[in-house]
Structure formats: C-alpha cells, structure tokens
C-alpha cells in the first residue's frame, strides 16, 4: 500500500479562531474519527484544542 493511504497528512486548525494550523500525520486504522489535540497557539499565547480539518 502507498504511504499516503495509511497515514495521510492532516491539517489541525485552532478552535480559538486565530487561523493557526499544525500539520501532522494520522493513522486511519487507529483513529478513524477526526483528531482533536490540545496544542499551543502562539497567537493567543495559550493551549487550545486543535481539530482536524477536511
């Protein structure tokens, strides 16, 4: 199988509404739903939830 089918690149967008994004890889077999990670948003200078964007 090609590399991009199992672990595609996904964009994580800040829920604080700043437009700041992280890019990461996701394993579709282990995480079929949308990812939600708590990461640092430098625009608001605090940790917020980042949700997977499709």
From Swiss-Prot:
Organism: Mycobacterium avium (strain 104)
GO molecular function: structural constituent of ribosome
Gene Ontology cellular component annotations, sorted alphabetically: cytosolic large ribosomal subunit
SUPFAM superfamilies: Zn-binding ribosomal proteins
Keywords: Ribonucleoprotein, Ribosomal protein
Highest taxon in the source lineage: Bacteria
GO term, biological process aspect, one: translation
Disulphide bridges, residue numbers: none
InterPro entries with a match to the protein in the record: Ribosomal_bL33, Ribosomal_bL33_CS, Ribosomal_bL33_sf, Ribosomal_zn-bd
Matches recorded under Gene3D superfamilies: Ribosomal protein L33
Family of this protein: Belongs to the bacterial ribosomal protein bL33 family.
Name of the molecule in the record: Large ribosomal subunit protein bL33B
Underlying gene: rpmG2
Entries under Pfam families matching the protein: Ribosomal_L33
